[in-house]
Amino acid sequence: MTTTPPNAATPGTDDNQLIAERREKLAALRAQAQATGRAAFPNDFKPGDHAVDLHRLHEGKSAEELEALAIPARIAGRMMLKRVMGKACFATLQDGSGRIQLYITSDAVGPEALAAFKHWDLGDILGAEGTLFKTRTGELSLKVGTIRLLTKSLRPLPDKFHGMADQELKYRQREVDLIMDEASRERFRARSKAVSSIRQFMVEHGFLEVETPMLHPIPGGANAKPFVTHHNALDQQMFLRIAPELYLKRLVVGGFERVFEINRNFRNEGVSVRHNPEFTMMEFYAAYWTHHDLMDFTEQILRHAARKAVGTAQLAYGGQAVDLESPFARLSVRDSLIAHAGLSAAEAADTTVLRAKLEAHGEKAPAHWSLAELQFGLFEAAVEEKLWQPTFIVDYPVEVSPLARASDADPTITERFELFITGREFGNGFSELNDPEDQAARFAAQASNKDAGDEEAMYFDTDYIRALEHGLPPTGGCGIGIDRLMMLLTDSPNIRDVILFPALRREG
């Protein structure tokens, strides 16, 4: 009995040699197909069953019941394992739902078909039809009556015992990662469930899903460095969007009182375990909501997504518990310094102390920074990474919140929040600034910063100011990082683990 075909990929084997051998087999298949009038890559096989359903429906039946019922099944998938034993062979077929074992004998399929099967390779895609039975070890299997090669695989799969050890290779050849690793497939299924559940949740709460431009004449909606391109027909510079915010708020001006969009944003910045230049965000806006309403709703969204994707809102990330079930904590920037940075109330209000604390963390605060900016700077340096359980941080300074409404009680801070979990930002929202003159002044300040060399500062968006002049109702808006949420829900340490095809340096 052989369990590994002569041309299966094993450590130390030359892949080029294996590919050459498989190409020879394909050439023979083409010649045979031409001689018989058949297709080398046929597309007329229609599977009627899936592995997971066959197991679910028939796993509990005894061998005797299966023999008496003679249940037919027709399945297609990729051959992952193969055992050749003279006039009989076993193979494991993997389809989109799972795996099932095939039993192929000369008596059932004929000597010619069995001989052909023995030359097929791991990774080939097969179609098989037969009846279900159980082996002597009790494994549900398909006793094959007919079997066909549907797609010849030219590249060998990684060795089943070693898999894809190179993590970057998994990102670069995601299709192979998905073939070999059930955990990877489950991770992306969970992502799909979560995104679908969020979309359904938004619609059920009266939000209209919309699509706004990906190419912007002016980048806006966030402080970030954009990707730049050129529109040939219009002969003008364009930017891949860094955020959809300004377009979505223009829709609220137009009368769509609740809107949301789940789509890609692009930021020409660094790559890390938490950052990918192309990433998925959901932004939503609701007329007559405040930042308090947004926080309540954001909690509900995350809780709902967790339950739908993984069955619970009590999670574990990196071996530590994360509780999305309980109410999320809420702290001002100032109070977070008292709770997590060891400052007293007096110290948190003392600019000299704050500057000294920042220097102790290796940060030199600019001379013009206000009290609120110093508090925020120290928050980023000393507090952010300590916020493991879900925590909303509120009362951000105006200087770092150019689109947020200022607080009526203290105009130096805004009605803005950010949500932190596991020491990372997951969401950002605020009561929207709907005073067109105030917004124009803030855009002007941002434009001055850009002229002074700040590449991430915002442009002055005349179209948006004109829209505001028609009147934006009191509105709340929030953005949630879908990729980081998926990292949390699937306990993934790297953002590239939850993006099917992450950004990588070009090979060669």
Curated annotation (Swiss-Prot):
Its cofactor is Mg(2+). Its EC number is 6.1.1.6. Homodimer. Pfam families: tRNA-synt_2, tRNA_anti-codon. The lineage of its organism: Bacteria, Pseudomonadati, Pseudomonadota, Betaproteobacteria, Burkholderiales. The gene is lysS. GO terms for biological process: lysyl-tRNA aminoacylation. This is Lysine--tRNA ligase. It comes from Methylibium petroleiphilum (strain ATCC BAA-1232 / LMG 22953 / PM1). Binds 3 Mg(2+) ions per subunit.
